[in-house]
Amino acid sequence: ESLLELNGDEERLAKLFAELEFKPMKGSANKPQTKDKNKNLNQNADKPTETKKIDSNYETILTQKDMKIWAKKLDDCKVFAIDTETDSLDTVTANLVGISLSDKEGEGCYLPIGHQYEGCPKQLDLKSVVDIIGSSVEKNRHKAVGQNLKFDIPILLRHGIALDSFHADTMLMSYVLNSTATRHGMDKLAMYYLNYETVKYSDVTGTASKQINFSSVEIDVASHYAAEDADITLRLFNKLDSLLAEKPIQKKLLQDIEYPLVHVLSRVEQNGAKIDKNKLSDHSIELSEKIEKLSSEAFKICLLY
């Protein structure tokens, strides 16, 4: 009998779930309980069945002339998105394969630098990219928007472009705005906030045993994928920025804590952290003593009941 289903206090549950931000549970607290054996099969029924299509104009940059045009665009725009493509996720050793930019929604470009495959066309040399695009990015760094810039900043720095400040990071904007609404990768954010299904990394590189390195992806395929990344990042920024405008506390948290930490954590990841072994050992002993004391107190409390 103790396993029988009991009626809950739905009103109190709803208030508690709202206070603790248990959003999926909050909705279920006000719904009558049913014994639908198939309810788990329909858990995504409230998600949009059709995704939005967007107009886009993406281009591959292969000449200094076109690079200068985009450098001017960065000078003239109010905000721009930047993203890097690499041959590895290790920021210490990864090589830069290309850079993508977007200065307005629907517009984007890709600058291929390090693709390697048979029949690969001539690409931009790194020095000219740093001299033309890099100098413009550095000059306009206060306009720069990215998605997880903690990855891009050290990659760019190792290849000669110092993005030592930036305007916004959409991953952090999403997390601060609502940490539990969705995962904070770009693909998930695009679906959640823009109702748009992006081209996935696996769509261009393949999966499992057939997966290839991004440097082996043909430039025309890589170009659309990368330029879309920058375009969607800019669209996400515009959306999230409008939502955060109504939440001054979260916006202050972003500016005062989250964004400065990006550079701190990036430096720690690149350079490591110096640790005082003696202090660490002493602290370990102190924590062990506290754990033992709390454990003893917990057992005493249990014996009382």
Tell me the role of every PLM-derived stretch:
Residues E1-R12, F214-V217, L261-S288:
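Short His/Asp/Glu-rich catalytic/ion-coordination signatures at enzyme active sites or charged loops
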Residues I82-E85, S102-K104, P112-G114, Q147-N148, ...:
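Generic beta-strand/beta-sheet core signal
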Residues A227-A230, L234, S281, I285-S288, ...:
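Short amphipathic alpha-helical segments with heptad-repeat character
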Residues E50-Y58, D90, A94-E246, Q255-Y259, ...:
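Active-site-proximal helix-loop-helix substrate-binding element of RNase H-like nuclease domains
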Residues L303-Y305:
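Conserved small/polar residues in nucleotide/adenosyl-binding loops
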Residues S2-I99, I113-E118, K122-S136:
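Long, highly charged low-complexity segments
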Residues E1, Q33, I285-I301:
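Accessory alpha-helical DNA-binding modules that contact the DNA backbone or grooves
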